[in-house]
From Swiss-Prot:
This is NAD(P)H-quinone oxidoreductase subunit 4L, chloroplastic. It comes from the Eukaryota. It is found in: Plastid, Chloroplast thylakoid membrane. NDH is composed of at least 16 different subunits, 5 of which are encoded in the nucleus. The lineage of its organism: Eukaryota, Viridiplantae, Streptophyta, Embryophyta, Tracheophyta. It comes from Barbarea verna (Land cress). The keyword Hydrolase does not apply. The keyword Cell cycle does not apply. Coiled coil: none annotated.
Length: 101
Protein backbone atom coordinates (compact mmCIF):
# COMPACT_ATOMS: atom_id res chain seq x y z
CA UNK A 1 0.00 0.00 0.00
CA UNK A 2 1.13 3.55 -0.59
CA UNK A 3 2.41 5.46 2.44
CA UNK A 4 -0.02 8.34 2.00
CA UNK A 5 -3.05 6.06 1.91
CA UNK A 6 -2.13 4.40 5.18
CA UNK A 7 -1.40 7.75 6.81
CA UNK A 8 -4.75 9.17 5.70
CA UNK A 9 -6.56 6.07 6.99
CA UNK A 10 -4.68 6.31 10.27
CA UNK A 11 -5.52 10.01 10.58
CA UNK A 12 -9.21 9.28 9.97
CA UNK A 13 -9.20 6.55 12.62
CA UNK A 14 -7.41 8.85 15.05
CA UNK A 15 -9.85 11.71 14.46
CA UNK A 16 -12.89 9.45 14.76
CA UNK A 17 -11.54 8.10 18.03
CA UNK A 18 -10.70 11.58 19.32
CA UNK A 19 -14.16 12.90 18.40
CA UNK A 20 -15.79 9.93 20.09
CA UNK A 21 -13.63 10.35 23.19
CA UNK A 22 -14.48 14.04 23.49
CA UNK A 23 -18.23 13.68 22.88
CA UNK A 24 -18.80 10.36 24.62
CA UNK A 25 -20.97 10.27 27.72
CA UNK A 26 -20.65 6.52 28.26
CA UNK A 27 -17.53 5.03 29.87
CA UNK A 28 -17.53 1.91 27.68
CA UNK A 29 -17.80 4.00 24.52
CA UNK A 30 -14.93 6.20 25.75
CA UNK A 31 -12.77 3.09 26.25
CA UNK A 32 -13.62 1.90 22.74
CA UNK A 33 -12.66 5.27 21.28
CA UNK A 34 -9.39 5.20 23.21
CA UNK A 35 -8.65 1.78 21.70
CA UNK A 36 -9.40 3.20 18.25
CA UNK A 37 -6.83 5.95 18.86
CA UNK A 38 -4.24 3.40 19.96
CA UNK A 39 -4.90 1.30 16.84
CA UNK A 40 -4.34 4.36 14.64
CA UNK A 41 -1.03 4.98 16.39
CA UNK A 42 -0.08 1.32 15.87
CA UNK A 43 -0.80 1.65 12.16
CA UNK A 44 1.61 4.58 12.03
CA UNK A 45 4.31 2.63 13.88
CA UNK A 46 4.09 -0.30 11.48
CA UNK A 47 3.86 1.90 8.39
CA UNK A 48 6.85 4.06 9.25
CA UNK A 49 8.86 1.06 10.35
CA UNK A 50 8.21 -0.67 7.04
CA UNK A 51 8.73 2.44 4.93
CA UNK A 52 11.94 3.82 6.44
CA UNK A 53 13.84 0.76 7.67
CA UNK A 54 12.56 -2.54 6.33
CA UNK A 55 15.41 -4.63 7.76
CA UNK A 56 14.73 -3.79 11.41
CA UNK A 57 11.46 -4.48 13.17
CA UNK A 58 11.53 -1.77 15.82
CA UNK A 59 8.12 -0.36 14.86
CA UNK A 60 6.52 -3.80 14.80
CA UNK A 61 7.95 -4.73 18.19
CA UNK A 62 6.81 -1.43 19.68
CA UNK A 63 3.37 -2.03 18.14
CA UNK A 64 3.13 -5.41 19.89
CA UNK A 65 4.15 -3.73 23.14
CA UNK A 66 1.43 -1.07 22.71
CA UNK A 67 -1.16 -3.79 21.96
CA UNK A 68 -0.23 -5.58 25.20
CA UNK A 69 -0.49 -2.36 27.20
CA UNK A 70 -3.83 -1.54 25.52
CA UNK A 71 -5.19 -4.98 26.41
CA UNK A 72 -4.25 -4.46 30.06
CA UNK A 73 -5.75 -0.96 29.96
CA UNK A 74 -9.00 -2.29 28.50
CA UNK A 75 -9.24 -5.06 31.09
CA UNK A 76 -8.64 -2.69 34.00
CA UNK A 77 -10.96 -0.06 32.52
CA UNK A 78 -13.79 -2.55 32.01
CA UNK A 79 -13.31 -3.86 35.56
CA UNK A 80 -13.60 -0.32 36.91
CA UNK A 81 -16.68 0.37 34.76
CA UNK A 82 -18.25 -2.89 35.96
CA UNK A 83 -17.61 -1.94 39.58
CA UNK A 84 -19.05 1.55 39.08
CA UNK A 85 -22.11 0.08 37.36
CA UNK A 86 -22.68 -2.33 40.26
CA UNK A 87 -22.57 0.51 42.78
CA UNK A 88 -24.15 3.40 40.86
CA UNK A 89 -26.34 1.58 38.26
CA UNK A 90 -25.00 3.90 35.57
CA UNK A 91 -21.98 4.09 33.28
CA UNK A 92 -22.47 7.72 32.30
CA UNK A 93 -19.37 9.84 32.76
CA UNK A 94 -21.16 12.96 33.97
CA UNK A 95 -23.01 11.01 36.71
CA UNK A 96 -19.85 9.51 38.14
CA UNK A 97 -18.79 11.69 41.09
CA UNK A 98 -16.49 9.20 42.78
CA UNK A 99 -13.43 11.46 42.75
CA UNK A 100 -15.20 14.62 43.92
CA UNK A 101 -15.24 13.61 47.58
Amino acid sequence: MILEHVLVLSAYLFLIGLYGLITSRNMVRALMCLELILNAVNMNFVTFSDFFDNSQLKGNIFCIFVIAIAAAEAAIGLAIVSSIYRNRKSTRINQSTLLNK
